[in-house]
Curated annotation (Swiss-Prot):
One of its GO terms (molecular function) is structural constituent of ribosome. Its main location: cytoplasm. One of its GO terms (biological process) is cytoplasmic translation. This is Large ribosomal subunit protein eL36. The gene is RpL36. Component of the large ribosomal subunit. Belongs to the eukaryotic ribosomal protein eL36 family.
């Protein structure tokens, strides 16, 4: 990447910039890290912990409770349609349905171990 100069025209127009270097040192090796913009949708340990803590304290939203009821009676397609209307996109709805079905399976496992 060429050094840019504060010119109004040409290939190097724009503000003076330098390449972002994000290098992590692990022991004796240099490992190239990820840029901040590439960390989108990657969950860190801290964010996972905080979200789990909030979920434990606050509980589920009403639409999530209704979806879990639909999943309990094996209405997966209806749950997907419901979530799609609430969340906006098909992919978000599928991800949420998967998340809620995993929560239901964990609850079932916890109930069987409690008996």
């Amino acid at each position: 990447m060429a050094v840019r100069y504060e010119l109004a025209i040409g290939l190097n127009k724009g503000h003076k910039t330098s390449k972002i270097r994000n290098v992590k040192y692990t022991g004796d090796k240099k490992v190239k890290g990820l840029r901040g913009s590439r960390l989108k949708n990657i969950q860190t340990r801290h964010t996972k912990f905080m979200r789990d803590l909030v979920r434990e304290v606050v509980g589920h939203a009403p639409y999530e409770k209704r979806t879990m009821e639909l999943l309990k009676v094996s209405k997966d397609k209806r749950a997907l349609k419901f979530l799609k209307r609430r969340l906006g996109t098909h992919i978000r709805a599928k991800r949420k349905r998967e998340e809620l079905s995993n929560i239901l399976t964990q609850l079932r496992k916890a109930q069987t171990h409690a008996k």
